[in-house]
From Swiss-Prot:
Disulfide bonds: none annotated. The gene is folE2. This is GTP cyclohydrolase FolE2. Its EC number is 3.5.4.16. It holds the Pfam family GCHY-1. Gene3D superfamilies: Urate Oxidase. It catalyses: GTP + H2O = 7,8-dihydroneopterin 3'-triphosphate + formate + H(+). HAMAP family: GTP_cyclohydrol_B.
Length: 261
């Protein structure tokens, strides 16, 4: 039986580098390391490598093989090791992996003590350039914000709304997802819960009223927290308030690279 030709391995004569080539939108089950153990989830993966000018194609099947071989719960260290293994497996000097997944935290209501799950959007991005690996943790945290101006000028309450605080943090050490989420929630007018009883609803309403925040306050307070955390090398921080009295959002962004200061 004659050998099956491997067209992908033949040389290319156009002399053009491809910065990223690979697979995108791969859904694959994962386990994620938590503060109390591990949590199953489903990741959406994008995996790319740099292709040199003389190579016709990359080894597409090896990206999936890499996911098949990995049986360790994801954290920053494991994700970094997966990134390095991909480059060896694909014979590449640069590459990028992105994974996003739902992450659940069991939260206890503030008065009744009833427990319920709360979901968050979490992601990890790893990129290798010039031999340097950079890992970024992304969390999207929904919170409550209450308008200080509305509280000041109104005789009957104040307008409030759900807000999204999104942090992309470049890390130099392991940072547990729950820890970062909890620190972000502390900066809001009030955090959210999956299930509340009437005494809890009273508590969160009054908590938000006693702790009003503009969108500017949200990003500045979260930035202050990130500035103090030595595990965070750089960050992009966004807050979006889905205004309850407008048909538009209020938005703010802060970026900082501590390595440059």
């Amino acid at each position: 039986m004659s050998a099956i030709p491997d067209v992908q391995s033949t040389p290319d004569t156009r002399n053009i580098v491809i910065q990223r080539v690979g697979v995108k939108g791969v859904r694959y089950p994962i386990t994620v390391k938590t503060s109390s153990g591990v949590q199953p989830s489903v990741g959406s993966w994008n995996m790319y490598v740099r292709l040199t000018e003389e190579q016709k194609g990359t080894h597409m099947s090896r990206f999936i093989a890499l996911l098949e071989e990995n049986n360790q719960p994801l954290d920053v260290a494991v994700f970094g090791a997966l990134m390095r293994k991909m480059l060896v497996l694909l014979d590449a000097d640069a590459g990028r992996i992105e994974v996003s997944f739902p992450y659940f935290i069991n939260k206890t209501a503030p008065v009744s003590g009833v427990q319920s799950l709360m979901d968050y959007e979490v992601g990890l991005t790893g990129e290798m350039k010039n031999g340097e690996l950079e890992v970024t943790l992304k969390v999207l945290v929904p919170v409550t914000s209450l308008c200080p101006c509305s509280k000041k000028i109104s005789a009957y309450g104040a307008h409030n709304q759900r807000s999204h605080i999104t942090v992309h943090a470049v890390l130099n050490g392991d940072l547990v997802v729950e820890e970062l989420i909890a620190k972000i929630e502390e900066q809001a007018s009030c955090e959210l819960y999956g299930l509340l009883k009437r005494p809890d609803e009273k508590y969160v309403t009054e908590r938000a009223y006693d702790n009003p925040k503009f969108v500017e306050d949200l990003v500045r307070d979260v930035a202050g927290m990130l500035n103090k955390d030595e595990r965070v090398l750089a960050y992009t921080l966004e807050a979006e308030n889905f205004e309850s009295i407008h048909n538009h959002s209020a938005y703010a962004l802060i970026e900082r690279d501590k390595r440059l200061s």
